[in-house]
Amino acid sequence: MLLSKNDILKARDFKMREVEVPQWGGSVMIKTLSSKDKGAFEQKTTADKLDLSTIMAEYCALIICDEDGKQLFTREDVEQLAEKSAAALELVFNEGRDLNTFTEKDLEALAGN
């Protein structure tokens, strides 16, 4: 069956996954990124002046969501999120990387900017 434009635009094509974060005493929901968000994140990570102190928090802010897939954190929350446990953020980051199919090659390309 060929899909129409309307079929494609109405498709619920985002995946979500619950991730247990022991450091925070519970779990969070994460989601796949939109093409727009993934592109913006990749562009940010290849910028000349990459801020490594907040990059994990920025990614986590993009993927942590409520049960309906609505993003919980805004850009304004990134600094506060960056103050949280590195182990907790790394756990969420790695789960998000897996869910969003960032390969090792993708990560090397991003890091190689």
Predicted regions and their residues:
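Short acidic-hydrophobic surface loop/beta-edge motif
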Residues: K15-Q23
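Short, surface-exposed, charged amphipathic helix/loop patches that serve as local interaction elements
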Residues: Q23-N113
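Extended acidic low-complexity intrinsically disordered regions
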Residues: M1-K15
